[in-house]
């Protein structure tokens, strides 16, 4: 799953570069959506890791 989070992050960075430099306004919208998806995935994995760490100890 970490692989997919990194893929979303890279795609959002590329779309952001294209969108925010004026190449395509639609890419900026895609970059925002993918960025927030990547942040949500990161937060979910962070919470799961913290819960799993406390369950092991």
Curated annotation (Swiss-Prot):
It is found in: Cell membrane. One of its GO terms (cellular component) is plasma membrane. Keywords: Cell membrane, Membrane, Transmembrane, Transmembrane helix. This is UPF0391 membrane protein Atu4467. Belongs to the UPF0391 family. InterPro entries: DUF1328. The keyword Cell membrane applies. Pfam families: DUF1328. Its main location: membrane. The chain crosses the membrane at residues 4-24, 33-53. The lineage of its organism: Bacteria, Pseudomonadati, Pseudomonadota, Alphaproteobacteria, Hyphomicrobiales. It is a multi-pass membrane protein.
């Amino acid at each position: 799953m970490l692989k997919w989070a990194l893929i979303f992050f890279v795609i959002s960075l590329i779309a952001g570069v294209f969108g925010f430099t004026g190449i395509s306004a639609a890419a900026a919208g895609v970059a925002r959506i993918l960025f927030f998806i990547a942040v949500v995935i990161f937060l979910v994995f962070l919470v799961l890791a913290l819960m799993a760490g406390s369950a092991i100890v």
